UniProtKB/Swiss-Prot annotation:
GO terms for biological process: D-ribose metabolic process; pentose-phosphate shunt, non-oxidative branch. Substrate binds at T28, G29, S30, T31, D81, S82, A83, D84, K94, G95, K96, G97, K121. Pathway: Carbohydrate degradation; pentose phosphate pathway; D-ribose 5-phosphate from D-ribulose 5-phosphate (non-oxidative stage): step 1/1. Homodimer. The lineage of its organism: Bacteria, Pseudomonadati, Pseudomonadota, Gammaproteobacteria, Enterobacterales. One of its GO terms (molecular function) is ribose-5-phosphate isomerase activity. Its EC number is 5.3.1.6. It catalyses: aldehydo-D-ribose 5-phosphate = D-ribulose 5-phosphate. This is Ribose-5-phosphate isomerase A. It comes from Blochmanniella pennsylvanica (strain BPEN).
Length: 218
């Protein structure tokens, strides 16, 4: 499949940006799976990885790369992750895999955030697809009502519990013109753990896998 080839190419291209880092952050998703595959080729140079999900942690363990606790680190040089959508300002929507809270924490801790995507993830305005929001279970209905007031159409993601023990609401009909403002508004709703808008901490470098090769935006 062409899309998988693009994901693999951009996953391997990200190796260039972690060669000098002994400890790195790693996200979650199908594109990141290819990056983890690529890490296997330089694992002897890596002291440890801060992982954003149990799924990625298991992948890293299988290839023998040790995991690190973010609390034990003074600094984190680089974080590599993918996105569900990304605009020309390097603002993103993330969270399809349910790991948005840990992804946001690691991104905030890292000096540099490398986003790896295939060209299908590029959008003019964020909100083409659903916006994931992690919520405390007891607040799910309250948060949903507040999201309706903001113009959204929230749907409960059934049979999904995050690594933090919470629920996910997927919000449709959100054309996100001012991503930073909406990120703040949703984060301020009681019961919201994290919203999948990455505007305040956007990517520093974006690698886009295209049919013509790797496109780099800085």
């Amino acid at each position: 499949m062409v899309q998988n080839k693009l994901k693999k190419s951009v996953g391997w291209a990200a190796l260039k940006y972690v060669q000098s880092s002994r400890i790195i952050g790693v996200g979650t998703g199908s594109t990141v799976t290819y990056f983890i595959e690529a890490l296997n080729s330089i694992k002897e140079k890596i002291e440890g990885v801060v992982s954003s999900s149990n799924y990625s942690s298991n992948q890293l363990k299988k290839i023998g790369i040790p995991l690190c606790n973010l609390n034990s680190l003074h600094e984190l040089d680089v974080y590599v992750d993918s996105a569900d959508e990304i605009d020309s300002h390097m603002q993103m929507i993330k969270g399809k895999g349910g790991a948005l809270t840990k992804e946001k924490i690691i991104a905030a801790a890292a000096k540099k955030f490398i986003c790896i995507v295939d060209s299908s993830k590029q959008v003019n305005i964020l909100g083409r697809g659903p916006l994931p929001i992690e919520v405390i279970p007891m607040a799910r209905s309250l948060v949903a009502r507040e999201l309706v007031r903001l113009g959204g159409l929230p749907e409960y993601r059934h049979n999904v519990i995050t690594d933090n023990g919470n629920n996910i609401l997927d919000v449709y009909n959100m054309k996100i013109v001012n991503a930073s403002l909406l990120e703040t508004k949703i984060n301020n709703i009681p019961g919201v753990v994290s919203v999948g808008i990455f505007a305040k901490r956007r990517a520093d470098i974006v690698l886009i896998g295209t049919r013509e090769g790797i496109k780099i935006i800085e």
